[in-house]
Amino acid sequence: MTQPNLNIVPFVSVDHMMKLVLRVGVETFLKELAGYVEEDFRRWQNFDKTPRVASHSKEGVIELMPTSDGTLYGFKYVNGHPKNTRDGLQTVTAFGVLANVGSGYPMLLTEMTILTALRTAATSAVAAKHLAPKNARTMAIIGNGAQSEFQALAFKAILGVDKLRLYDLDPQATAKCIRNLQGAGFDIVACKSVEEAVEGADIITTVTADKANATILTDNMVGAGVHINAVGGDCPGKTELHGDILRRSDIFVEYPPQTRIEGEIQQLPEDYPVNELWEVITGRIAGRKDARQITLFDSVGFATEDFSALRYVRDKLKDTGLYEQLDLLADPDEPRDLYGMLLRHEKLLQSESTKPAA
């Protein structure tokens, strides 16, 4: 991917993103993206970190997620509106920008609705690689909406999970998930309750959408030795797990100041001890210590993961042509003459309007 004129910014549309993902292959894309996510967790201390800037309403939330490693800057605009599906709209939509810190000029503008689904699943699988039981093959997925297939494929690509136990309040959502994963190499069981779904599961993924303090999992459903991948709780007042599960588990988070506001641990005292995922990945602390330990990844999504996704797409776009050249920036030849640029364009328009018709 080249950027010959600084005023021209490569733009990846939804169509181009889908073509890129399919050209690479979904599982390969997830595996390679997970590598970028893990690489950036390993250099965690290089990043400028802040909780996302959120605007909450009774309908949902709109957020900005910025971060920088000192060389590149990235941000994502993302919403979360659980009731949107009732109107035929997506629960989550997003776009993102990658920029050069030295000049402040953007280098990439891309859709991130599809990319966020991929990066969320890739991050969950990275965490599970360090926290799940060894040789885990069976995963329960509670909530079979837009994120469920991505989670399944990421865990297959990165951990070798090949048995799925699915449950959703809406049987049509489960049927959709099964239909979409046909031929992907899974042994799938559609379950009639959460209790049935978690039976025999090594990994339990909760990925529901309702903006409420729900109790998707209760303490009696969680046996020793499992890994819980809690994805659905991602804003104040939205949780999925009973508090007793948290107190039995070793909890791992992305960025504590954000997770204490938005994650499952919002149910616990502010000083409740948690572990940071980057410290596990870098070997500073242990992840899974024994076979009976319950590990919990309290996932809310953090800006460094979007940064990783933006870096990956930038690198993957090279020589593909899967982007448009967007005339985004007013960049006059004389930087101090922005108004003159406007006047010159006016003259150009006038000359074009007076040209005789061919």
Swiss-Prot record:
<dbReference type="InterPro" id="IPR036291">
    <property type="entry name" value="NAD(P)-bd_dom_sf"/>
</dbReference>
<keyword id="KW-0456">Lyase</keyword>
<feature type="binding site">
    <location>
        <position position="299"/>
    </location>
    <ligand>
        <name>NAD(+)</name>
    </ligand>
</feature>
<dbReference type="GO" id="GO:0006525">
    <property type="term" value="P:arginine metabolic process"/>
</dbReference>
<comment type="similarity">
    <text>Belongs to the ornithine cyclodeaminase/mu-crystallin family.</text>
</comment>
<feature type="binding site">
    <location>
        <position position="208"/>
    </location>
    <ligand>
        <name>NAD(+)</name>
    </ligand>
</feature>
<dbReference type="Pfam" id="PF02423">
    <property type="entry name" value="OCD_Mu_crystall"/>
</dbReference>
<feature type="binding site">
    <location>
        <position position="238"/>
    </location>
    <ligand>
        <name>NAD(+)</name>
    </ligand>
</feature>
<protein>
    <recommendedName>
        <fullName>Ornithine cyclodeaminase</fullName>
        <ecNumber>4.3.1.12</ecNumber>
    </recommendedName>
</protein>
<keyword id="KW-0056">Arginine metabolism</keyword>
<feature type="binding site">
    <location>
        <position position="234"/>
    </location>
    <ligand>
        <name>L-ornithine</name>
    </ligand>
</feature>
<feature type="binding site">
    <location>
        <position position="119"/>
    </location>
    <ligand>
        <name>L-ornithine</name>
    </ligand>
</feature>
<keyword id="KW-0520">NAD</keyword>
<feature type="binding site">
    <location>
        <position position="76"/>
    </location>
    <ligand>
        <name>L-ornithine</name>
    </ligand>
</feature>
<feature type="binding site">
    <location>
        <position position="52"/>
    </location>
    <ligand>
        <name>L-ornithine</name>
    </ligand>
</feature>
<feature type="binding site">
    <location>
        <begin position="231"/>
        <end position="234"/>
    </location>
    <ligand>
        <name>NAD(+)</name>
    </ligand>
</feature>
<dbReference type="InterPro" id="IPR023401">
    <property type="entry name" value="ODC_N"/>
</dbReference>
<dbReference type="GO" id="GO:0008473">
    <property type="term" value="F:ornithine cyclodeaminase activity"/>
</dbReference>
<feature type="active site" description="Proton donor/acceptor">
    <location>
        <position position="234"/>
    </location>
</feature>
<feature type="binding site">
    <location>
        <position position="91"/>
    </location>
    <ligand>
        <name>NAD(+)</name>
    </ligand>
</feature>
<dbReference type="GO" id="GO:0055129">
    <property type="term" value="P:L-proline biosynthetic process"/>
</dbReference>
<comment type="function">
    <text>Catalyzes the conversion of L-ornithine into L-proline with release of ammonia.</text>
</comment>
<feature type="binding site">
    <location>
        <position position="168"/>
    </location>
    <ligand>
        <name>NAD(+)</name>
    </ligand>
</feature>
<feature type="binding site">
    <location>
        <begin position="146"/>
        <end position="147"/>
    </location>
    <ligand>
        <name>NAD(+)</name>
    </ligand>
</feature>
<dbReference type="InterPro" id="IPR003462">
    <property type="entry name" value="ODC_Mu_crystall"/>
</dbReference>
<feature type="binding site">
    <location>
        <position position="300"/>
    </location>
    <ligand>
        <name>L-ornithine</name>
    </ligand>
</feature>
<feature type="binding site">
    <location>
        <position position="119"/>
    </location>
    <ligand>
        <name>NAD(+)</name>
    </ligand>
</feature>
<comment type="pathway">
    <text>Amino-acid biosynthesis; L-proline biosynthesis; L-proline from L-ornithine: step 1/1.</text>
</comment>
